[in-house]
């Protein structure tokens, strides 16, 4: 009897302790969800999970949902992502005010559990604003220039890849097929030349598998499961959930990248770099005795992975959308081909120098960038110190989302933004007219370092393709135009026929 009583007493004590722990955690979570003084207003959220449910349950994509909330709460409003205080910037004016006029304050990255797990806040894309990021970005920018677009010969390498690409399309002989794999392989090879000094064949199944895992992770990163993991990282102990699939994919990718890096460095000659990996290893050698150096084997793997996915995912999806819209609007396709024939000739070699002579083609590509919003919410920013924007107080460490979709559909700068209309980028004389409010590569200190290369790839692949082929849907079957949800917006899978002109 005494033992039974002692057991019951122990169980009661344990239950009481557990209750107090859960109560304390609940109070802590609710306190985290309180808006600070002077913080921007926003939609009400649920206890504990805040606005995560609203985002997940909405019938609209997150960037559309956020733009509609801005019509209620203003261009700058707040969301509670499970205790993660978040500010959303909408419209060109407020995005420019923060990323350009207060660029240093808004150049940080949030310390989200996902980033901590994936890259330990190292590498390049998700690293904190400071010396490590400055050093890595400097090296990446110099490498893209020195081993890539800064060399006149690099354009010929892109054109060589466009020939491989077009020859592969030719094998389908006008039969319907999905462009995705071919475009992904071709575009990634341009980045591979800079990073590893070599391209991979379209039959390399190992490399294709890595790219597929990258692409899957881009979708998984925008899932409700990942938002919940960021809010409650302890759910990482559970063996299921999309965040777990993301981590498994990342482990496979990092292992494969490690082997690629080892292979690329076999014939390395110190201080005579031939590609990004060589240059990074030189930086590691120079920083061996510097305890503050952030160049490491681990950060090399993270940086290589980020450069590949950033250089592949966005450009691939721009071209996939461009192909879709050419088939959807044959009159626009015809006008582009007419300009190509006039400037390049039906059999001439495409040239980057021809871009300034082809205003309509330029207008079409820019309208694809605006209308399709490849990275609608950009990469999340964070404040490196307390900030004041439009009279609102934004504390240091606040997560900041830049709704680039709202910029590209801002009626203050775009007439009829819901309409695909390339002519908006032409002036009254038919010349290309650059628009200030087109910012697909973001703004400020964290703007995309590969913008110049991406624009070169888009132009050369697009013109080389339309120079040789006429594009149309099989049996006039128009695909669903609603994009797939992810960190990037890619088209739904679709088939296309490419017939030799």
Swiss-Prot record:
Residues 1-26 form the signal peptide. Substrate binds at residue 250. Its cofactor is heme. Heme binds at residue 448. The keyword ATP-binding does not apply. GO terms for cellular component: cytoplasm; endoplasmic reticulum membrane; intracellular membrane-bounded organelle. Its main location: endoplasmic reticulum. InterPro entries: Cyt_P450 (IPR001128), Cyt_P450_CS (IPR017972), Cyt_P450_E_grp-I (IPR002401), Cyt_P450_sf (IPR036396), Cytochrome_P450_fam2 (IPR050182). Pfam families: p450 (PF00067). Pathway: Hormone biosynthesis; vitamin D biosynthesis. GO terms for biological process: calcitriol biosynthetic process from calciol; organic acid metabolic process; response to cesium ion; response to ionizing radiation; vitamin D metabolic process; vitamin metabolic process; xenobiotic metabolic process. Keywords: Disease variant, Endoplasmic reticulum, Heme, Iron, Lipid metabolism, Membrane, Metal-binding, Microsome, Monooxygenase, Oxidoreductase, Signal. One of its GO terms (molecular function) is heme binding. It catalyses: calciol + reduced [NADPH--hemoprotein reductase] + O2 = calcidiol + oxidized [NADPH--hemoprotein reductase] + H2O + H(+); vitamin D2 + reduced [NADPH--hemoprotein reductase] + O2 = 25-hydroxyvitamin D2 + oxidized [NADPH--hemoprotein reductase] + H2O + H(+); 1alpha-hydroxyvitamin D2 + reduced [NADPH--hemoprotein reductase] + O2 = 1alpha,25-dihydroxyvitamin D2 + oxidized [NADPH--hemoprotein reductase] + H2O + H(+); alfacalcidol + reduced [NADPH--hemoprotein reductase] + O2 = calcitriol + oxidized [NADPH--hemoprotein reductase] + H2O + H(+). The keyword Iron applies. Gene3D superfamilies: Cytochrome P450. It is found in: Endoplasmic reticulum membrane; Microsome membrane. It is a peripheral membrane protein. It is linked to Rickets vitamin D-dependent 1B: An autosomal recessive disorder caused by a selective deficiency of the active form of vitamin D (1,25-dihydroxyvitamin D3) and resulting in defective bone mineralization and clinical features of rickets. The patients sera have low calcium concentrations, low phosphate concentrations, elevated alkaline phosphatase activity and low levels of 25-hydroxyvitamin D. Homodimer. A cytochrome P450 monooxygenase involved in activation of vitamin D precursors. Can metabolize vitamin D analogs/prodrugs 1alpha-hydroxyvitamin D(2) (doxercalciferol) and 1alpha-hydroxyvitamin D(3) (alfacalcidol) forming 25-hydroxy derivatives. Mechanistically, uses molecular oxygen inserting one oxygen atom into a substrate, and reducing the second into a water molecule, with two electrons provided by NADPH via cytochrome P450 reductase (CPR; NADPH-ferrihemoprotein reductase). Belongs to the cytochrome P450 family. This is Vitamin D 25-hydroxylase. It comes from Homo sapiens (Human). The gene is CYP2R1.
């Amino acid at each position: 009897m005494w033992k039974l009583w002692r057991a019951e007493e122990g169980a009661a004590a344990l239950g009481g302790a557990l209750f107090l722990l859960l109560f304390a955690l609940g109070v802590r979570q609710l306190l985290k969800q309180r808006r600070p003084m002077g913080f921007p207003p926003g939609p009400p959220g649920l206890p504990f999970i805040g606005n995560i449910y609203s985002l997940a349950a909405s019938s609209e994509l997150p960037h559309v949902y956020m733009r509609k909330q801005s019509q209620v709460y203003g261009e700058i409003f707040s969301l509670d992502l499970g205790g993660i205080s978040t500010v959303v910037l909408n419209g060109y004016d407020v995005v420019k005010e923060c990323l350009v006029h207060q660029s240093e304050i808004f150049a940080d990255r949030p310390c989200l559990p996902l980033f901590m797990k994936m890259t330990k806040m190292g590498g390049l894309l998700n690293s904190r604003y400071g010396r490590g990021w400055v050093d890595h970005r400097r090296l990446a920018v110099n490498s893209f220039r020195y081993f890539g677009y800064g060399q006149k010969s690099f354009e010929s390498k892109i054109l060589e890849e466009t020939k491989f690409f077009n020859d592969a399309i030719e094998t389908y002989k006008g039969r319907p097929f999905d462009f995705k794999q071919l475009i992904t392989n071709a575009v990634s090879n341009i980045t591979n030349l800079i990073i590893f000094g070599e391209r991979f064949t379209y039959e390399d199944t190992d490399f294709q598998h890595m790219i597929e895992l990258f692409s899957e992770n881009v979708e998984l990163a925008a899932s409700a499961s990942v938002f919940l993991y960021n809010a409650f990282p302890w759910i990482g102990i559970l063996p299921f959930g999309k965040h777990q699939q993301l981590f498994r994919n990342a482990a496979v990718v990092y292992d494969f990248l490690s082997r690629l890096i080892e292979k690329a460095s076999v014939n390395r000659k110190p201080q005579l770099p031939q590609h990004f990996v060589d240059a990074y290893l030189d930086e590691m050698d120079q920083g061996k005795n510097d305890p503050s150096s952030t160049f490491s084997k681990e950060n090399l793997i993270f940086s290589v992975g980020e450069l590949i996915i950033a250089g592949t995912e966005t450009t691939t999806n721009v071209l996939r959308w461009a192909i879709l819209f050419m088939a959807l609007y044959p009159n626009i396709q015809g006008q582009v081909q007419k300009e190509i024939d006039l400037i390049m000739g039906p059999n001439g070699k495409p040239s980057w120098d021809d871009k300034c002579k082809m205003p309509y083609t330029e207008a079409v590509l820019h309208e694809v960038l605006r209308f399709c919003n490849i990275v609608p919410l950009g990469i999340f920013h964070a404040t490196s110190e307390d900030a004041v924007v439009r009279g609102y107080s934004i504390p240091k460490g606040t997560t900041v989302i830049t709704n680039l979709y709202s910029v590209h559909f801002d009626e203050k700068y775009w007439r009829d933004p819901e309409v695909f209309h390339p002519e908006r980028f032409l002036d009254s004389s038919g010349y290309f007219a650059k628009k200030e409010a087109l910012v697909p590569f973001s703004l400020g200190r964290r703007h995309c370092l590969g913008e110049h290369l991406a624009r070169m790839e888009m132009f050369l692949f697009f013109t080389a393709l339309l120079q040789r082929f006429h594009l149309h849907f099989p049996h006039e079957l128009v695909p669903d135009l609603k994009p797939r949800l992810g960190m990037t917006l890619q088209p739904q899978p679709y088939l296309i026929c490419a017939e030799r002109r």
